[in-house]
């Protein structure tokens, strides 16, 4: 017997029992996006490698350690996208939809990073991202956060996520802070681990992200970025905080929050949870006003965020188990006897015409009535329609409510209206 081929480590299959919940969650998210006027953009999963190096930063964990990069047959370096913002900006520039325009976009799909697989973190994972172009005020930053807060309420997880905010200022402000931080780190070289020593000169702000508890204690005495903010960034941040407070959104200022990608400026934020064990990020983003110009477009203010769907699904399952997938089907169509199969197919198509939202499954493969009713239960049907030879001859169908066992025999022309009532 040939050896079975398994899925790649960290790249998971999602079976129908799982995808039903995914679909309900995604549909809930999309409904909110539509309510805020955001439009979908669909992007390739493979991009030219220089796109991510320029956008994310060459001295980042993502570019240095985590990207799936390969040469194609022409010798061009390509990369499976590790995140969605860079590709969205590239598409906006390429198709001319950013210059002097306001765009509110969203996308969803798989991303790829070579990481150690663990609960909620995989090598192929799914993100839903939102990007806004052409608006630079704190009000649009606030709207993005308000929209995510609405998601948490819709999904029933609002009490299990907390908002952390910071401002990392302008490029000049970060340059001044970088000098102060490097000077502090140099004074404590002997207390830094190998990873922090490597980052100290290449990307010192990333030292603030260390998971080493001893260095975290050391950093309590480090300079704080907010002390180096330029006036415009400080005013922007204060205005954002006021908007959130007036909107009833509680938050904590986290001076160590810098995000792992180099393209951010001013506002950065994360929604975090402790309901999945150690604190983890559910959704994160911020402003990246320089990226469009950096990638060859005209200077365009921009802000956005991305949310990991695997972690979101785990959180919903953990803290709101009542948020369940919708039943597999509404109606199961049962038939038995000569000529009933064709009649069942014809009836099913007429019902789909009359009730476009109806989820109807027709029994195939035979079986007596008992077996077919068992299949109806398996698929979670709420109503069974039964066609036997007598019903076909009379132009009728038996309609059975599977929740209470009540049934009636109706003319086929009346079945659609009865189903609409039963399933309302």
Curated annotation (Swiss-Prot):
One of its GO terms (cellular component) is cytoplasm. Transmembrane segments: none annotated. Its EC number is 6.1.1.21. It is found in: Cytoplasm. The keyword Cytoplasm applies. One of its GO terms (biological process) is histidyl-tRNA aminoacylation. GO terms for molecular function: ATP binding; histidine-tRNA ligase activity. Homodimer. NCBIfam families: hisS. This is Histidine--tRNA ligase. It comes from Pectobacterium carotovorum subsp. carotovorum (strain PC1).
């Amino acid at each position: 017997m040939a050896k079975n081929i398994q899925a790649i480590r960290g790249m998971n299959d999602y079976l129908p029992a799982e995808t039903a919940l995914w679909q309900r969650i995604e549909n809930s998210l999309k409904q909110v996006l539509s309510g805020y006027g955001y439009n979908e953009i669909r992007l390739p999963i493979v991009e030219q490698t220089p796109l991510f190096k320029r956008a994310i930063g060459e001295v980042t964990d993502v570019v240095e350690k985590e990207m799936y990069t390969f040469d194609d047959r022409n010798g061009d370096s390509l990369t499976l996208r590790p995140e969605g913002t860079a590709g969205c900006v590239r598409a906006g520039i390429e198709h001319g939809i950013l210059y002097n325009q306001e765009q509110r976009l969203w996308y969803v799909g798989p991303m790829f990073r070579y990481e150690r697989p663990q609960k909620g973190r995989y090598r192929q994972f799914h993100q839903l991202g939102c990007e806004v172009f052409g608006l630079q005020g704190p009000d649009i930053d606030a709207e993005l956060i308000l929209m995510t807060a609405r998601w948490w309420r819709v999904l029933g997880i609002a009490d299990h996520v907390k908002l952390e905010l910071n401002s990392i200022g302008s490029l000049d402000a970060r340059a001044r802070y970088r000098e102060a931080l490097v000077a502090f780190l140099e004074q404590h070289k002997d207390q830094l681990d190998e990873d922090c020593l490597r980052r100290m000169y290449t990307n010192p702000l990333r030292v603030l992200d260390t998971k080493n508890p001893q260095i975290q204690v050391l950093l309590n005495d480090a300079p704080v970025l907010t002390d180096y903010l330029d006036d415009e960034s400080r005013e922007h941040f204060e205005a954002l905080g006021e908007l959130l407070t007036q909107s009833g959104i509680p938050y904590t200022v986290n001076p160590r929050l810098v995000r792992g990608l180099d393209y951010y400026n001013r506002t950065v934020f994360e929604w975090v949870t402790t309901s999945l064990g150690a604190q983890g990020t559910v959704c994160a983003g911020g402003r990246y006003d320089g990226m469009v110009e950096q990638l060859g477009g005209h200077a365009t203010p921009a802000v956005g965020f991305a949310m990991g769907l695997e972690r979101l699904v785990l959180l919903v399952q953990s803290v709101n188990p009542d948020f369940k997938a919708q039943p597999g089907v509404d109606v199961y169509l049962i038939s038995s006897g000569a000529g009933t199969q064709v009649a069942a197919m014809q009836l099913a198509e007429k019902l789909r015409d009359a009730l476009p939202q109806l989820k109807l499954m027709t029994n195939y493969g035979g079986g007596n009535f008992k077996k077919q009713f068992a299949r109806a239960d398996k698929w979670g049907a709420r109503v069974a329609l039964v066609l036997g030879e007598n019903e076909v001859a009379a132009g009728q169908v038996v309609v059975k409510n599977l929740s209470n066992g009540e049934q009636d025999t109706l003319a086929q022309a009346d079945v659609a209206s009865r189903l609409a009532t039963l399933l309302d």
